[in-house]
Amino acid sequence: MEKLGTINISYHAIATIAFQSALESYGVVGLANENFARGLSRFFSKEPTSGVIVHEDESGISVDLYVIIEYGTRISSVAESVSHSVKFNIESMTGIPVKAVNVHVRGLRVSDMD
């Protein structure tokens, strides 16, 4: 196959895939800004890269996710599911190897019992 040029995938695009994959995972109710001290006004952000940091080196990419999990779910199971989902979706959509997905649980959301 003749090579016609290069393909560049931005960190923003990769972060958006990671963000959406995490939000679609059972038990995740939102992503928090990585710098939690920025205040509660950005606690549940809908910005498609908030709470996601992408790092790249010669061996692939790593992703840090800062998630809010639903109270009552098994935190370790939710985090593991998020990790697998994010890795699978990034690799299948971009073809870029993901060497690590680090899930940081920033808080729990307690649902109203009404």
Stretch-by-stretch model annotation:
Residues 1-71, 80, 96-108, 112-114:
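Contiguous, often N-terminal, cationic amphipathic patches that form binding interfaces
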Residues 75-94:
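Short, non-transmembrane amphipathic alpha-helical segments
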